[in-house]
Amino acid sequence: MPRRKKKIKEASEGQNLEKKDLETTSSVSIKKKRRLEDLFIVISDSDGEETKEENGLQKMKTKQSNRSKCLAKRKIAQMSEEEQFALALKMSEQEAKEVNNQEEKEEELLRKAIAESLNSRWSSDASAARPRPLSTGPSSHPHQDSTKDSGTTEGIWQLAPPSLCKGSQISQGNEAEEGKEPWDHSENPEEEPLSGSSGSQDQSSRPVFENEKVKCFDRCTGHLAEHTQCGKPQESTGSGCAFPKAVQGRGDTSRQCLPTPADTKGLQDIGGTVHYYWGVPFCPAGVDPDQYTSVILCQLEVYQKSLKMAQRQLVKKRGFGEPVLPRPPFLIQNECGQEEQTSEKHEGLSEDVRAGAREERQGSGASVWHSETKDSQKSPITSLKQRLLLEEEPTTGRGQSSQGLFVEETSEEVLKSSEGDDAVPASQSIAVLTSKRDLVLMPEASTEEVTVCPETQLSSFEPLDLNGEDSVDGREIPTELGMTVSNRQVDNREAGKDSRPPAVSASARVSCPLCNQDFPPTKIEQHAMYCTGLMEPETVLTRRRREAKKKSDGRTAAQPALDISRKEKCYLCKSLVPLGEYQCHVETCLQLANVDRENGTEGMRRPRVCAPVEGKPKQRLRKSKEKGHSQGRLLSLLEQSEHRTTGVERTPKCSEAGAFRMPSPDVEEAGCSRERQSSLSKLNLNESPIKSFVPVSEATNCLVDFKGQFAFRSQTKSGRGRRRKS
């Protein structure tokens, strides 16, 4: 049983497929019939009367379509989903193809219909234009040709200006097929070569011209140009005219060619008339077309000329300025000098002042000072200038060393010139020099100065005030020391200046134990801090180091002298000591403590009264070496005192402290003087104070445990990290 059912199903499916094929073929044939019927569309001027045959065909079409729809519905109902889907795809593809083909055919039919209507209109225009005269000449013989387009008609084909008929040619060129054929012209020297191109028509509607002479009229120049036309010209589809086109192309719309016979007198009588043709522009009703087109051409010419004028005004070439070139600094200084010259003229200064200022500005570096020393003998202005500069220089630090190089030569000449010469008032010269001070020093400021270290040069020409230095530093300079002291005077560079008193009569100087050079007492400590033991006659000082020296000198000078009245507490004897005597007092206390430690209890009973030294003021030791040793001993004694205070040794310490408090100030002064003499005798000048320095990491007597401190911090940090993680 099931086998028979399968066979029946297969047979039914085969029948269904055959029916579908028949339906598709019938539908295709019906559509083809529709296309054929559509092809036979006739464009006519009638109102579209329908014939009886068309009505019968439409009835048959409707019946067949209804039948095919019913059959298709039945077949689709019997088909499976996959078959229905495949059938739908096929049907959609076929419909799409049919629609595309139908659209293409309709477009072709429309083009043909438009071309036929245009051909019929051209024939009517040609017949209407026959009685219209185109020129007022005595003879006009236009060429005629017979064309065959639904009848034989005769027309006149004329050359029209390209500016008038260009728009119609473009608008109608898309609808008809176009072709191009060259024109050959014999050139006139007054006219540019022309070439024409126009839309092509069918061979039946194409007129033929052979060896026709055409004359073109140029409105701009007013000349006529003859051209022989060979070959087969083509007419435009819009107006039935062949248009020449300018190849060289100036954009000139006023050039045009007029149709003329072989005789040239007719065109000369016409002059500048413009013939109007339908198309472009469309002339309004009631207006002469020739006048209308001539007005439009004039407007185009005016517009073109105004446009060119505007473009010429817009484009203007701008001149370039002078190039900006880098200039060396001396040129800039010369310009500054020129500006100053103008300002000096307004101020009414003399010519010698300006000459001296120019000469001084041109120098740079060390040459400035040499030129000043030479010019100081000639003009008093330069000497006053040097005097002002010397007064402005600071008296401490590098100021003394820089002044000592040139002041000795010019100091006497300044005085002589200031007394002898009174040509220029002093007030004016000083004002001018103060205003120009910065410009004189410009070359020095531009380059980094290379100065000589003040410690390696002689002292300044001013006498040293020992009492003043003591008050500034808060210390006392020893007058009689068991050290190498040399008394030097400033060397005079000129032999005639020996009678002048020396700048420094007898100044105490201290020699450095490393480099064996002499320095004043106020400079030896600063030199010892940076001394390396090498002989450096000249050291380079940068601006930063000079500024640092200035600041340090200013700080030492700004220390108040009232620091002497301050009192500090001695941690050995527990007594208040003036600040000036504190160091000496501490040293004596330490020495006494060492002696007591060696001799036992005898040191406490021994009187500490020393014979006073008469005729000597209060003095102190200033060696930084002893400072380092005393600091180390002070720390050790502090540790011992802390150990003694705990336990049995507390009472003797108190008695010892009481013994230290007892002595009077006179006794302490005597002890200080005696200990100072003994310490001076034991001084070794070959040892530098920098050698006694002990770094913090190697200090054994220090109370602070740096290693333990660091370990404790690391433990705390690790503990914090663990807490945060938890």
From Swiss-Prot:
Q: What does this protein do?
A: Ubiquitin-binding protein. Specifically recognizes and binds 'Lys-63'-linked ubiquitin. Plays a central role in the BRCA1-A complex by specifically binding 'Lys-63'-linked ubiquitinated histones H2A and H2AX at DNA lesions sites, leading to target the BRCA1-BARD1 heterodimer to sites of DNA damage at double-strand breaks (DSBs). The BRCA1-A complex also possesses deubiquitinase activity that specifically removes 'Lys-63'-linked ubiquitin on histones H2A and H2AX. Also weakly binds monoubiquitin but with much less affinity than 'Lys-63'-linked ubiquitin.
Question: Which segments show compositional bias classed as Basic and acidic residues?
Answer: 9-23, 177-188, 640-653
Q: Which domain of life is it from?
A: Eukaryota
Positions of the region Necessary for interaction with NR6A1 C-terminus? Answer: 400-507
Q: Please report any disulfide bonds recorded for this protein chain, giving both cysteine positions.
A: none
Chief localization class?
nucleus
Location of this chain's protein in the cell: Nucleus
Q: Would the keyword Ubl conjugation turn up in this protein's UniProt record? A: yes
Which InterPro entries is this protein grouped with? Answer: Rad18_UBZ4 (IPR006642), RAP80 (IPR038868), RAP80_UIM (IPR040714), UIM_dom (IPR003903)
Q: Where is this region: UIM-linker?
A: 97-103
Region: Zinc-finger-like region, residue numbers: 512-589
Q: Which residues belong to zinc fingers classed as UBZ4-type?
A: 509-536
Record remark: domains = The tandem UIM domains form a continuous 60 Angstrom-long alpha-helix and mediate binding to 'Lys-63'-linked ubiquitins. UIM1 and UIM2 bind to the proximal and distal ubiquitin moieties and recognize an 'Ile-44'-centered hydrophobic patch. Since UIMs don't interact with the 'Lys-63' isopeptide bond the UIM-linker region between the 2 UIM domains determines the selectivity for 'Lys-63'-linkage, and its length is very important for specificity. The Abraxas-interacting region (AIR) mediates the interaction with ABRAXAS1.
**Could you tell me which residues carry Phosphoserine?**
S29, S44, S46, S140, S205, S379, S402, S427, S636, S664, S688
**Biological process GO annotation list?**
DNA repair-dependent chromatin remodeling; double-strand break repair; mitotic G2 DNA damage checkpoint signaling; negative regulation of DNA-templated transcription; positive regulation of DNA repair; response to ionizing radiation
Protein family per UniProt:
Belongs to the RAP80 family.
Name the positions where Zn(2+) binds.
C512, C515, H527, C531
An annotated GO cellular component: BRCA1-A complex
State where the record puts the cross-link Glycyl lysine isopeptide (Lys-Gly) (interchain with G-Cter in SUMO2). K20, K31, K75, K90, K245, K436, K551, K569, K616, K707
Per UniProt, residues of the UIM domain are 80-99, 104-124
Spell out which residues are annotated as carrying Phosphothreonine: T51
Protein name listed in UniProt: BRCA1-A complex subunit RAP80
A GO MF term: K63-linked polyubiquitin modification-dependent protein binding
- PTM remark: Sumoylated.
Which residue stretches does the UniProt record annotate as biased composition, category Low complexity? 194-205
Q: List keywords of the entry alphabetically.
A: Chromatin regulator, DNA damage, DNA repair, Isopeptide bond, Metal-binding, Nucleus, Phosphoprotein, Repeat, Transcription, Transcription regulation, Ubl conjugation, Zinc, Zinc-finger
